[in-house]
């Protein structure tokens, strides 16, 4: 699972198809295996801290459903 903490800006967070707006100071809990996405809604940079928990931490555990940035 992951936890995101918004440090600066305004974000649209989508978890399993449900959208919420979050602001500085908000904490978002993302359940294991949930489809999730974060988008900047501010004119300033969106800054957030991501905390991962579990047994495995590597980029190859990511499954990109939609990639607007061609990663």
Region annotations inferred by a language model:
Residues 12, 19-21, 44-45, 55:
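Short, surface-exposed beta-strand-loop junctions and turns on beta-sheet-rich folds
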Residues 9-11, 25, 33, 54:
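Glycine-centered flexibility sites
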Residues 3, 16-35:
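Short acidic-glycine-tyrosine-enriched beta hairpin
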Residues 3-5, 29, 62-63, 69:
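Broad hydrophobic/π-residue packing in well-ordered secondary structure
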Residues 1-14, 51-52:
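Short, conserved beta-strand element in jelly-roll/cupin
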Residues 37-71:
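Double-stranded beta-helix
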């Amino acid at each position: 699972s992951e936890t995101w903490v918004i440090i600066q800006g305004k974000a649209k967070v989508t978890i399993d198809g449900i959208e919420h707006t979050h602001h500085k100071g908000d904490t978002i809990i993302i359940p294991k295996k949930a489809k999730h996405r974060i988008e900047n809604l501010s004119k300033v940079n969106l800054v957030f801290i991501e905390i991962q928990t579990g047994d495995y931490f590597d980029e190859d555990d990511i499954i990109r459903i939609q990639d607007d940035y061609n990663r």
